[in-house]
């Protein structure tokens, strides 16, 4: 408990910083009242938790003097585009939010004047021009005027910063402004579905826990966990309603009190609906759920407040809940069970919870990996594309370094949105496929090109690599049943220990300038000495393969074409170091075709590419190599589509 109290002090310090930041972010507020529906009580309390969003529901060149209006974008374009104007000036903007014109006028020597004029589209807001990167990345505002004239004397990049509106309806809660509805500008310079507000004390309601935001006041719309991304679509404004759960009375609990900290040690109540743990008891913060404290409870849903930072072993063991709502303020798991493959106190917290399918996580701490190359950008584009005709390319890091989604979009005449879902080869492919099966439908294409290894082939054990990838959108868990996976809380524990040590202020709208909206990594990558090796046929258990095939079958039933290819491989490593033969390749590709329900569209030998196109590993290609390898995939994909069209 003393260790937990020290953690509590640490988190409290972070929370104070959060409060300062929250006060500094002055929202644009409106005077409105939330309109609760008939099924919501007068107090704004909801009696259930929604299942949420699980599916049930060009470059132009300017002359040295003149004005250039960019061509009208195709309907799929909702991305940050790059235009070159004159010798030095690059402008980045999103045509979904604004119209742009640029004129240049000759100056002295190589310099020239540029005038950039922006006209916002209905509902979107202009947040100013900035150089080198977006304001979200900490760059200063160069001008707030919609017509900006400046001297261009050297290479420079001008960003047009834009925002949409998130309107939060308090639904019985309170805000420092005293209003029922408050509006926040959400930066869309890069992201299309900005993160919602995390749990940093923006909205409060005495005796209640804020469970989620919802598109309907009664909680029956699309739900979004605090800090995650709601689906925005093409809207310039989205309405989100606070959904509250009434706290259980303190008399229902047994607890220990140490100073200003409370540890719950038992539960005496009989709640069968929503059991919301109080944030305070006797004026002290509830920071810990003790060993077996909530074991055997009958509640369908258990909700933890943001004050809870410690879970002890078997905290919820043998409970009947189907939904557990927690926060990422939990940074400590304690107990006697340690060591072994996935054996930790963290994994015991849900022992025997056979009905627990739904894990909801509200964000409290700042993200560590907001600009991580495996994460934020890809999932934003995937969410935006969920109702569009699309191709989703799934792989490990070979997808980051060896595939260019923009090339494929252009080659297919923009008929498809193409998402580069290359992440990491050590993340469960089963998790990705279950998630993606809820976001893909008729005429979509899944293009799966896994590196050889148990994880991408369907091993269902989760690890901290996954958590790094999803920490900016925990709502990916709304699309999966956690009973299908092992080491759920053990892997979460690993991530949270990292956060507890390294937590600092990193806002959600920061982005990586080296990754485009499609998820392509477009930095300059030169060829380098390539080492490594290849071990084929590393398949997981039959049960894991069967689960992968269940997801592929679901996609096929929904009209998705499931195509299988192979990751790019350094030819010299493959043949000279790993000593693989054509017979080895044939055996491996044959096993992939035999084990998985999909159509193999590639010859594996075609993806063994000259080592001069690889950068720092046998899987990671140079930027030129990524374009070359994408051309191979495009040819294979076109051939398959033409074959099916006959």
Task: Kindly give the residue locations of the regions a language model identified.
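Membrane/wall-proximal cationic-aromatic binding patches
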Residues: 69, 360-412, 434
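Structural signature of tandem-repeat unit edges
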Residues: 7, 252-260, 270-287, 297-310, ...
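Secreted/periplasmic serine-hydrolase-like ester/acetyl group-modifying domain
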Residues: 459-560
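Secondary-structure capping and domain/repeat boundary segments
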Residues: 66-247, 335
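Membrane-embedded segments
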Residues: 390-473
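C-terminal motif of bacterial Sec signal peptides marking the signal peptidase cleavage site
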Residues: 19-22
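Bacterial signal peptide processing site
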Residues: 24-26
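Histidine-centered active-site loop/cap adjacent to the catalytic His
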Residues: 615-646
């Amino acid at each position: 408990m003393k260790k937990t109290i020290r953690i509590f002090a640490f988190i409290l310090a972070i929370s104070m910083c959060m409060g300062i930041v929250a006060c500094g972010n002055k929202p644009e507020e409106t005077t409105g009242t939330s309109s609760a529906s008939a099924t919501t009580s007068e107090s704004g309390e909801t009696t259930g938790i929604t299942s949420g969003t699980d599916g049930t529901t060009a470059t132009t060149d300017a002359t040295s003097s003149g004005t250039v209006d960019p061509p009208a974008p195709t309907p799929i374009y909702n991305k940050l585009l790059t235009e070159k104007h004159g010798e030095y000036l690059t402008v980045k903007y999103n045509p979904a939010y604004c119209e742009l014109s640029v004129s240049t006028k000759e100056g002295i020597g190589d310099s020239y004047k540029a005038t950039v004029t922006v006209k916002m589209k209905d509902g979107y807001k202009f947040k100013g021009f900035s150089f080198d990167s977006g304001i979200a990345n900490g760059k200063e505002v160069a001008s707030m005027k919609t017509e900006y004239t400046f001297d261009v004397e050297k290479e420079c990049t001008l960003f047009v910063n834009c925002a949409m509106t998130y309107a939060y309806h308090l639904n019985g809660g309170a805000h420092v402004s005293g209003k029922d509805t408050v509006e926040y500008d959400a930066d869309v310079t890069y992201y299309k579905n900005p993160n919602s507000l995390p749990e940093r004390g923006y909205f409060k309601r005495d005796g209640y826990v804020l469970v989620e935001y919802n598109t309907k006041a009664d909680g029956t719309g699309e739900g979004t966990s605090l800090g995650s991304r709601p689906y925005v679509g093409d809207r310039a404004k989205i309405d989100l309603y606070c959904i509250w759960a009434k706290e259980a009375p303190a008399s229902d609990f047994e607890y220990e009190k140490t100073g200003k900290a409370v540890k719950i040690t038992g539960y005496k109540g009989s709640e069968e609906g929503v059991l919301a743990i109080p944030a305070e008891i006797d004026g002290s913060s509830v920071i810990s759920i003790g060993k077996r404290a909530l074991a055997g409870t009958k509640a369908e849903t258990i909700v933890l407040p943001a004050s809870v930072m410690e879970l002890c072993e078997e905290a919820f063991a043998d409970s009947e809940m189907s939904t557990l709502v927690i926060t990422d303020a939990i940074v400590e798991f304690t107990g006697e069970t340690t060591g072994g493959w996935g054996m930790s106190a963290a994994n015991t917290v849900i022992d025997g919870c056979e009905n627990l399918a739904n894990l909801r996580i509200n964000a409290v701490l700042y993200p560590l990996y907001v600009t991580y190359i495996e994460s934020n950008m890809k999932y934003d584009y995937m969410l935006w594309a969920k109702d569009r005709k699309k191709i989703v390319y799934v792989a490990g890091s070979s997808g980051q370094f060896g595939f260019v989604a923009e090339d494929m979009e252009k080659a297919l005449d923009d008929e498809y949105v193409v998402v580069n879902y290359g992440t990491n080869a050590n993340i469960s492919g089963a998790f990705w496929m279950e998630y993606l099966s809820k976001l893909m439908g008729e005429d979509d294409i899944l293009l799966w090109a896994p590196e050889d290894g148990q994880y991408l082939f369907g091993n269902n054990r989760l690890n901290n690599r996954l958590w790094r990838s999803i920490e900016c959108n925990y709502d990916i868990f709304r699309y999966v049943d956690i009973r299908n996976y092992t080491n759920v809380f053990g892997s979460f524990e690993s991530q949270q220990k990292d956060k507890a040590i390294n937590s600092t202020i990193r806002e959600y709208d920061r982005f990586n300038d080296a990754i485009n909206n499609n998820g392509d990594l477009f930095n300059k990558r030169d060829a380098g000495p390539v080492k490594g090796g290849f071990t084929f046929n590393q398949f997981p258990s039959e049960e894991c393969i069967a689960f992968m095939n269940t997801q592929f079958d679901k996609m096929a039933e929904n009209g998705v074409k499931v195509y299988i290819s192979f990751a790019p491989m350094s030819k010299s490593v493959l043949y000279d170091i790993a000593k693989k033969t054509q017979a080895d390749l044939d055996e491996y590709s044959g096993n992939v075709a035999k084990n998985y329900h999909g159509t193999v569209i590639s010859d594996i030998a075609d993806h063994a590419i000259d080592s001069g196109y690889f950068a720092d590993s046998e899987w990671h290609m140079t930027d030129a190599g990524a374009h070359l390898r994408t051309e191979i995939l495009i040819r294979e994909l076109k051939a398959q589509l033409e074959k099916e069209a006959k």
